[in-house]
A protein has these predicted regions:
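Bacterial N-terminal signal peptides that target proteins for export
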Residues: 1-6
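Acidic, surface-exposed loops and disordered segments
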Residues: 17-214
Length: 214
C-alpha cells in the first residue's frame, strides 16, 4: 500500500511538473537584420524634393542626433541653425539668382525645376564651427548623424557645401547675419531635408581600397 501511494504521488508530481510553462530560448533576429546598417546602406543623396513641409518635431529629432555625434575632446564647437521658412529660402534664392546673371550658373537657375538653391529642400540645417584642429571633422560627423536620422524617419537629405560660398558675398551677407552665429564661428556646410521626390539608384562602392595589415 505504501509503495502504491509513493508511486501515485510521483506520478502526480511528474504530470504537474510537465504542465508548467517551460523556459524557451530567446528568439534571435537574423544576423543580417540590423536597422542601423540598413539605414547606412540605403541612404542616398536626394536632389529632388516634394514641397511638403517637414514637421518640426522630426527636425528636432534629426538635429538632436547631430548634436550627439562624436567630436574632439567633446568640445562641441559647433552651432546649428534650422531654416524651414519658405519666405527665407525664396528670398535667398532670388538674391542668388540675381548674383549669377551673366555667369555659367545662370542657365542652371533659370531651369523650371529650380525652386531654391538648396536642391529645393523645404528645410535646411546650417552647421557652423569654431575653426580648430578637429572641428571640420566634428561637423562632418554631425552631418552624417543627421542624414542617417533623416533616413530612419523616411526623409531624404543631402549635404552641401556649394551654397556656403554665397554667404561670403556682399549679396549673401544679410542672410549670413540673419543666422545670428556667435562671434568666431564660421558657416561650414548645410544639410537639406525633405520628402524625397526621387529614388536614385546606388552608386557602386569600391571595396578594393580596403586592406587589412598583418
Amino acid at each position: 500500500m505504501k509503495r502504491l501511494f509513493t508511486a501515485t504521488l510521483l506520478a502526480v508530481l511528474f504530470v504537474g511538473t510537465s504542465c508548467q510553462p517551460q523556459p524557451t530560448a530567446p528568439v534571435s533576429a537574423p544576423a543580417d537584420a540590423n536597422q542601423t546598417i540598413d539605414d547606412i546602406l540605403s541612404r542616398r543623396s536626394i536632389r529632388a524634393y516634394k514641397e511638403q513641409a517637414v514637421p518640426r518635431d522630426l527636425l528636432d529629432k534629426i538635429v538632436e542626433c547631430g548634436i550627439w555625434a562624436p567630436n574632439g575632446m567633446n568640445a562641441q564647437q559647433w552651432e546649428v541653425r534650422v531654416v524651414d521658412s519658405k519666405e527665407w529660402l525664396d528670398n535667398i534664392t532670388a538674391a542668388y539668382k540675381s548674383s549669377v546673371k551673366g555667369t555659367p550658373a545662370e542657365r542652371m537657375v533659370e531651369q523650371p525645376e529650380f525652386k531654391n538653391m538648396f536642391r529645393n529642400a523645404p528645410a535646411v540645417i546650417f552647421v557652423a564651427h569654431k575653426p580648430g584642429h578637429c572641428t571640420q571633422v566634428d561637423c562632418g560627423l554631425m552631418a552624417g548623424n543627421m542624414m542617417l536620422a533623416a533616413t530612419s524617419l523616411d526623409l531624404g537629405s543631402i549635404c552641401m557645401m556649394g551654397p556656403i560660398g554665397f554667404f561670403r558675398t556682399d549679396a549673401g551677407k544679410p542672410f549670413l547675419e540673419s543666422l545670428r552665429l556667435s562671434e568666431g564661428y564660421e558657416l561650414l556646410l548645410c544639410v537639406g531635408v525633405g520628402y524625397a521626390d526621387e529614388q536614385p539608384n546606388p552608386t557602386p562602392r569600391n571595396m578594393d581600397v580596403v586592406q587589412y595589415i598583418d
